[in-house]
Curated annotation (Swiss-Prot):
PANTHER family in alphabetical order: APYRASE, SOLUBLE CALCIUM-ACTIVATED NUCLEOTIDASE 1
Main location: secreted
Cofactors demanded by this protein: Ca(2+)
Name recorded for this polypeptide: Apyrase
Organism: Phlebotomus duboscqi
Gene3D superfamilies: Apyrase
Signal sequence residues: 1-21
EC number: 3.6.1.5
Classification of source organism: Eukaryota, Metazoa, Ecdysozoa, Arthropoda, Hexapoda
């Protein structure tokens, strides 16, 4: 009996030791990023063609550790639609009603990106209140309920004549039929500035998502400062904070992201919640435009501000949208 007990005890101890020593299983996430090439979007082969680039990557997770790899291939996508000689400056990636969309921040066009790499115009967003001749500077997009929400930077600025431009304070609600409702978010943007103790400063938004699981807004600002917006200095300013807000922005929390960013001038351009993380873990793009040069970084953080993967360089071009893909099979495969 004693011998049997020893054998069982040894087996249990061995099992425990093997479990503790065994490597955690790996989880793989496929994702794609899309570029805003600014003036480089004009095709060198055809002045009437404008291009963007989509790249595919893979994020690997083992426990709370992350790393990633990017495919070498550039998937070029083209459109002839432009505004004042600028086009395909695509600033976000979003799945809505099982289709993939992207947003031109010059023309205001919402494009559907098909698997064969065609960019198909779906909706044109007019600037500001929706009754203007120029396009909306779309910078972020998310889904909430049955609607797509599209927003801009959330800042006001004065032009060379001193006239105040507040078009970026508006957001667009779009239903599945393409009907657009324009809403002024000045009150919400001002509340966020107050919550961050920046009432006279500015917060530049490009990365906003609605969390269905937590019933709250999550925002990762691109830039933030206690000082008023200044075009002479904004290139040197980033932001290393998370904003969490209730549905109607009655309750707002500002969270510092722990650690030091690779470059203080880099700020968030897009993020998505990782599946099965209960909207607790975020994969995010950070971009920088400084002294005529650009770069894109990838990072992983949690909702408390803990950095799970520090900023890592992705590309020297500026990629402003990220989307998670269930599969990349057949993705952006042009028909021969």
């Amino acid at each position: 009996m004693f011998l049997k007990f020893c054998v069982v005890a040894f087996a249990i101890c061995l099992s425990i030791n093997l479990s503790e020593g065994a490597p955690s299983s790996e989880t793989i996430y496929k994702f794609a990023i899309i570029a805003d090439l600014d003036r480089k979007s004009i095709s060198q082969k055809n002045d009437n063609n404008y291009k963007s680039i989509v790249k595919i990557g893979q994020l690997n997770q083992v426990g709370r550790k992350f790393n990633f790899a990017m495919e070498n291939k550039d998937h070029e996508i083209f459109t002839k639609y432009a505004y004042k000689g600028r086009g395909a400056e695509l600033s976000e990636f979003l799945v809505y009603k099982w289709k993939l969309y992207t947003f031109d921040d010059k023309s205001g066009i919402v494009f559907k990106l098909k698997n064969n790499a065609d960019l198909v115009p779906w909706v044109i967003l007019a600037n500001g209140n929706g009754d203007q001749v120029d396009g909306f500077k779309a910078e972020w997009a998310t889904t909430k309920g049955d609607k797509m929400y599209v927003g801009s930077t959330g800042i006001s600025w004065s032009d060379s004549t001193g006239k105040l431009n507040s078009n970026s304070l508006w957001i667009k609600e779009i239903n599945q039929d393409g009907k657009v409702l324009s809403s002024n978010w000045k009150e919400y943007y001002d509340k966020m500035k107050s919550a961050m103790n920046m009432p006279k400063g500015f917060i530049w938004h490009e990365a906003v998502n609605w969390s269905k699981k937590k019933n709250q807004w999550v925002l990762l600002p691109r830039k933030c400062s206690e000082l008023p917006f200044d075009t002479e200095t904004e290139e040197t300013i980033g932001c290393n904070k998370i904003i969490i807000a209730s549905e109607n922005f009655q309750k707002i929390n500002s969270i510092d992201i722990k650690g030091t960013p690779f470059d203080p001038a880099a700020g968030f351009s897009s993020f998505k919640f990782l599946p099965d993380s209960d909207d607790q873990i975020l994969i995010a793009l950070k971009t920088i435009e400084k002294n005529g040069k650009t770069a894109t970084y990838l990072t992983v953080i949690d909702i408390t501000g803990k950095v799970l993967m520090s900023d890592k360089i992705v590309n020297k071009d500026k990629f402003e949208g990220i989307v998670l893909l269930k599969s990349t099979e057949g993705f952006l495969k042009r028909k021969e």
